[in-house]
């Protein structure tokens, strides 16, 4: 158990997280025991905050993490216990294994003037062949081919554009598609190019915004016809319902059903209504805490109408849909309020990532085709049309942190929207502490200064 000083610190830390999200967040119970967990669906601001706690608070002793630790996260850990031989759905390769074990006993810890210890040059790595390891895993082979550090390995080259890649029947199509994309993105970059070129403005805009979920060359003519009709009608999209319908009409309908990014879900009208709702919250600048409440309310409304309703929850699912071998759905029935809240927290993070990484590119195409009202475009992309707030977001702040600064601390900022630069007053952080702002937002802002 925590002593008095540590308990006070824990109360403050938990209040910060509770206020930012919800009091039912499971991480709070773990934090009380000196444990934090870290995975790709932890909200970014929370993940950065708890990483800092692990570095600075001796009461936080244990970190349970997924392979997100491979993404350059450096923490002052001395021991690592590897319980699984998987990275996502694939087996952990030697290069990923070496990257993973390299996250502990970093040089800045080993050679620290105050706490450094040369014994850390031999990190303690434990591979636990237990219940979490794949049942069909060959443990001896894993030790010899993946975990053995003194064996010589050569990198596996998967990028078809690199010279060392062997081109065969399996990746010939990938090479052609990559070459088509590059040449159409920048004319003349591939010498002797003789494959397809886009012939429409719509096709070019799709290429320039990284759209690769369907064959642009096959469908660009049909897309351009629809775009011409919209332009003849002087269409300027300024609401999320129309936006989602046009994205479906112009792009989504051409995406194969088996697409890996689940964009084909938007062929379903109910899914489009859901993402229209999510985008409305962005336009309305809803906080994370508010979005959690709204998602829970939305699910409860579905449950009241149909007690057997299933909801899409991605990797957290335990129910398969028709024609699928992957569990991506679950039922509200039988779940406690705490379970529903925690499901909402991870799903909001994943839905925001889905919008930013998969959906926004189509918004960009529509904007480049002059089919979006400019202020509405800014609200969809940034959550605001205020130039100063947008400048802060471009400089690395979240919408909530940027909005807080503009609303309460603008005099501590020097913003140049023309050059997209921000200068922070040295007294900003002390003033925010004085005003009792949430330490999660203070930490985020401090890291951007």
Language-model region placement:
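Short glycine-/acidic-enriched loop or helix-start segments at secondary-structure transitions
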Residues: 47, 73-75, 92, 137-138, ...
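Conserved C-terminal RecA-like helicase domain
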Residues: 1-62, 77, 86-99, 105, ...
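C-terminal accessory/interaction regions of large nucleic acid-associated machines
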Residues: 13-14, 27, 107, 168-203, ...
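A short beta-strand element within the Helicase C-terminal
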Residues: 64-86, 124-126
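Conserved segment of the helicase C-terminal RecA-like domain
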Residues: 89-142
């Amino acid at each position: 158990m925590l002593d008095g000083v540590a308990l006070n610190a824990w109360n403050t830390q938990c209040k910060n997280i509770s206020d930012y999200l919800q009091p039912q967040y499971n991480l709070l119970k773990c934090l009380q025991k000196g444990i934090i967990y870290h995975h790709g669906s932890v909200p970014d601001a929370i993940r950065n905050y708890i990483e800092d706690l692990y570095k600075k608070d001796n009461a936080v002793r244990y970190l349970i993490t997924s392979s997100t630790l491979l993404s350059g996260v450096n923490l002052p850990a001395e021991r690592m216990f590897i319980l699984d031989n998987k990275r996502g759905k694939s087996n952990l390769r030697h290069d990923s294994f070496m990257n993973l074990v390299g996250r502990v006993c970093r040089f800045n810890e080993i050679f620290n003037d105050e706490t450094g210890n040369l014994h850390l040059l031999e990190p303690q790595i434990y591979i636990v062949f237990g219940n979490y390891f794949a049942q069909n895993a060959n443990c001896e082979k894993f030790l010899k081919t993946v975990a053995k550090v003194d064996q010589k390995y050569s990198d596996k080259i998967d990028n078809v554009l690199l010279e060392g890649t062997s081109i065969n029947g399996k990746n010939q199509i990938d090479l052609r598609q990559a070459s088509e994309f590059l040449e159409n993105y920048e004319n003349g970059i591939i010498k002797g190019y003789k494959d397809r070129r886009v012939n429409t403005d719509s096709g070019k805009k799709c290429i320039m915004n990284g759209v690769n979920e369907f064959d642009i060359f096959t469908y660009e003519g049909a897309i351009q016809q629809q775009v011409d009709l919209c332009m003849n009608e002087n269409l300027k999209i300024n609401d999320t319902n129309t936006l989602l319908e046009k994205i479906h009409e112009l792009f989504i309908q051409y995406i194969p059903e088996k697409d890996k990014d689940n964009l084909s879900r938007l062929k379903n009208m109910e899914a489009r209504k859901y993402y229209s709702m999510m985008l409305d919250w962005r336009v309305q600048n809803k906080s994370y805490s508010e979005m959690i409440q709204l998602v829970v309310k939305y699910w409860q409304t579905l449950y009241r109408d149909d007690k057997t309703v299933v909801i899409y929850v991605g990797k957290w699912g335990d129910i398969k849909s028709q024609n699928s071998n992957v569990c991506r759905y679950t039922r509200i029935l039988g779940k406690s309020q705490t379970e529903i809240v925690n499901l909402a927290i991870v799903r909001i993070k994943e839905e925001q990532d889905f919008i930013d990484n998969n959906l926004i590119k189509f918004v960009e195409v529509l904007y480049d085709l002059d089919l979006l009202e400019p202020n509405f475009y800014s609200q969809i992309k940034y959550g605001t049309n205020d130039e100063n707030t947008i400048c802060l977001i471009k400089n690395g702040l979240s919408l909530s942190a940027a909005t807080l600064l503009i609303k309460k601390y603008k005099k501590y900022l020097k913003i140049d929207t023309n050059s997209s630069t921000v200068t922070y007053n040295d007294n900003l952080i002390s003033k925010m502490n004085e005003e009792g702002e949430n330490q999660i937002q203070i930490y985020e802002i401090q890291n951007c200064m």
